[in-house]
Amino acid sequence: MNSIWAWFAIASAAAVTAATAQNLGGDVKSFYELKTTYLDGKPADLAAFQGKVTLVVNVASKCGFTPQYEGLEKLHREMSGKPFEVLGFPSNDFGGQEPGTAAEIAAFCQRTYSVDFPMFAKVVTKAAPDQSPIYKFLGASGHLPGWNFSKYVIDKEGRVTAFFPSAVKPDAPELRSAIQKALGE
């Protein structure tokens, strides 16, 4: 009887592993293999950022962390001229704090924080049937956002090298250090 349960446990684990690999896009090895949509509705091939270090952030307009847009824009401007980009992915997953349309999000970001870094269409970051492939890939690193303004450092090859929760601000020494390390500085 124990061998039947052992076989069942092994078969179940194999099925879960296979399903997880399939849900994560299976063969996706690099963030830069993924495609998505810009906030203005145009297609976005993340291969355009290959060779750069990127900071991927799930953002929201009505969150206590929303003022971090200012720090993200400052980081974006300070790092111009280096192979680095901040990428913003609006999400309504946490507290319904990004309820706006794409046009409303764009207007808010421009009017309030003069956001100039690339912004993408609203995504689902949480593990769910409609989770964005972007966040399926990022989640394979062992970290999914616990709230808005979670941050992932992606190296030039498209690998997640660091994760920072919402409370870590864009000017935090540990975040800046992780970016510099990914840049090879």
Residue ranges with predicted function:
Residues 22-47:
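N-terminal "domain-start" segment that seeds a small globular fold
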Residues 38, 58-62:
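Amphipathic alpha-helical repeat scaffolds
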Residues 65-131:
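Structural microenvironment flanking redox-active thiols in thiol-disulfide oxidoreductases
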Residues 1-4:
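Positively charged n-region of N-terminal signal peptides that target proteins for export
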Residues 133-185:
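Thiol-/selenol-based redox modules, centered on thioredoxin-like
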Residues 6-15:
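Bacterial N-terminal signal peptides
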Residues 16-21:
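Sec/Tat signal peptide C-region and signal peptidase I cleavage site
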